[in-house]
A protein has these predicted regions:
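Conserved catalytic scaffold of divalent metal-dependent phosphoesterases
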Residues: 1-89
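Binuclear metal-dependent phosphoesterase catalytic core
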Residues: 2-13, 18, 122-190
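Flexible, active-site-proximal loop/turn residues at the rims of small-molecule/cofactor binding pockets
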Residues: 21, 112, 199
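Short, conserved loop/helix-junction motifs that constitute active-site signature segments
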Residues: 56-57, 97-102, 119, 183-186, ...
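Structural motif
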Residues: 61-62, 105, 123-125, 190, ...
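Conserved beta-sheet core of the metallophosphoesterase superfamily
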Residues: 69-153
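Accessory, non-catalytic peripheral segments of nucleic-acid enzymes
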Residues: 149-238
Length: 238
């Protein structure tokens, strides 16, 4: 728990802080094999105790947590491919119903896509990452969240789309020439490029693609003739 007095405000900001929890350490700490349920009970009681002691209606009350949180009985948020799964070998789902009623907003971390997982007892929001971390997040808009808190009032939540940084794109083209045209039109993009080809891409074709664009992360040839691929694999094994 932390309380802040900020210039220009005549009321304090109270923050309940919950970092990432390792499942094995949680088991040892709580002395239980059911770390998931044990963690949920522990967080419920711990949060409630702090909220009852410090979080009245005379200040702004905020929960900040690195947890896999969802509405009980609702659809689970999707974890990004490149993020360590927090609910496998770590802490499992923590339900939004455990958030103390005194909280006005829950700022959540771990998931990379902006999403609101619940609005009760307060908005529980993953603001997501400011930039895409992998091509599993290609074409995904990124946001920051602005939250206005006043004592005893619902939080006013505004999301702002980020426009800085290079976007990630996954693109497939029927041939090198079409790919070169698209690359010329999108210079400020990181690209995972798939090129359909009757045979394998030549060294000159690969060189021309890289020369046309500085943001190519990888080039994937999609060979139409499966027998060529099979022959290449057979020659490698031989």
């Amino acid at each position: 728990f932390a309380e802040f007095r900020l210039p220009g405000f005549d009321y304090p900001l109270r923050v309940l802080l919950t970092p990432y929890t390792n499942g094995q350490r949680a088991k040892r700490y709580m002395g239980t094999e059911d770390a998931d349920e044990g963690l949920r009970v522990f967080l419920r009681d711990h949060w409630a105790g702090l909220a009852d002691k410090y979080c009245d209606t005379e200040g702004g009350n905020l929960l900040v947590a690195h947890l896999f949180m969802a509405r009980e009985g609702g659809e689970l948020p999707e974890e990004p491919e490149d993020e360590r799964p927090i609910n496998i070998g770590g802490a499992d789902v923590v339900y939004t119903s455990l958030i103390p009623p005194a909280m006005q907003y829950a700022a959540l971390g771990h998931l990379h896509r902006w999403q609101t997982v619940d609005t009760e007892p307060c908005p529980a929001v993953y603001s997501g990452s400011p930039l895409s971390y992998s091509f599993s997040e290609a074409e995904q808009d990124k946001y920051v969240t602005l939250v206005d808190l006043e004592p005893g009032c619902p939080a006013r939540v505004t999301k702002r789309r980020l426009t800085s940084g290079h976007p990630l794109a996954r693109r497939r083209f029927e041939g090198v020439e079409v790919a070169l045209q698209w690359l010329a039109e999108h210079p400020d993009t990181w690209v995972e490029l798939t090129v359909a080809t009757d045979t394998f891409l030549t060294a000159q074709e690969v060189k021309s693609l890289h020369a046309a664009h500085d943001g190519i992360v990888c080039i994937i040839p999609d060979v139409r003739d499966a027998s060529l691929v099979n022959d290449r694999v057979a020659s490698i094994h031989d």
